[in-house]
Amino acid sequence: IAFEIAAKTLSAEVISITEKSSSLTKGENLRDTVLNIQALGADAIVIRHSSPGSALFLSRTIEVPIINAGDGAHEHPSQALLDIYTLREKLGELHGKKITILGDILFSRVARSNLWGLIKLGADVTFAGPSTLVPREFEELGATVTHNINDALKEADAVMLLRIQHERQSSSHFPSLSEYTKIFGLKFQRSEM
């Protein structure tokens, strides 16, 4: 909806297509669907798809610009741009700022996209949450990883909270939501750190 509102604000004509209203339900593949949309004269295509890498694949397949509005648990660069804009609006220059991203990092497309953008702007990024949702492998991408929320909040210039991505998980990655909230929830006392 946000892209549609933004486009209409800029006087663009918008056609919203859902998977249910497209030929995908009749067996047409995503590539052919997008090629048909291009043939109908689209100037750009905004896509949100459950398959990781779908936007990149399509950008290499067709000639019109593809805007990635989220692809599975892979990326969500448009949300990251909005988050980074908001952080810069509130904090100014992000170089050297300490940004903590707390929550379900493993299944979050927003966390990855924010990490790449924030690092490019010189921010220090910390991922925090339970070890089952914040694996150490994210250190290889440039993040500091901690499973101690108090350490993550110390000296943070900004904290981003991510919800648990239940829809992308096939099993529970923590004993219960109440236990997760008790250990990793941002409480008023912690927000003053």
What are the language-model segments listed below?
Residues 1-85:
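Phosphate/diphosphate ligand-binding glycine-rich loop within oxidoreductases
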Residues 36-39, 58-61, 65, 91-95, ...:
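Solvent-exposed alpha-helices and their adjacent loops that cap or buttress functional pockets
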Residues 21-25, 44, 103-105, 138-139, ...:
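Short, flexible loop segments at the rims of nucleotide/cofactor-binding pockets, characterized by
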Residues 1-6, 89-162:
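Glycine-rich phosphate/diphosphate-binding loop of Rossmann-like nucleotide-binding domains
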Residues 50-51, 105, 163-168:
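Short glycine-rich anion-binding loops that position phosphate/pyrophosphate groups of nucleotides
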Residues 4, 34, 55-56, 115-116, ...:
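Short amphipathic alpha-helical segments and helix-helix/interface helices
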Residues 138-193:
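Rossmann-like adenosine-cofactor binding region
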Residues 29-30, 51, 111, 145, ...:
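Amphipathic coiled-coil/heptad-repeat helices and related helical stalk/stem segments
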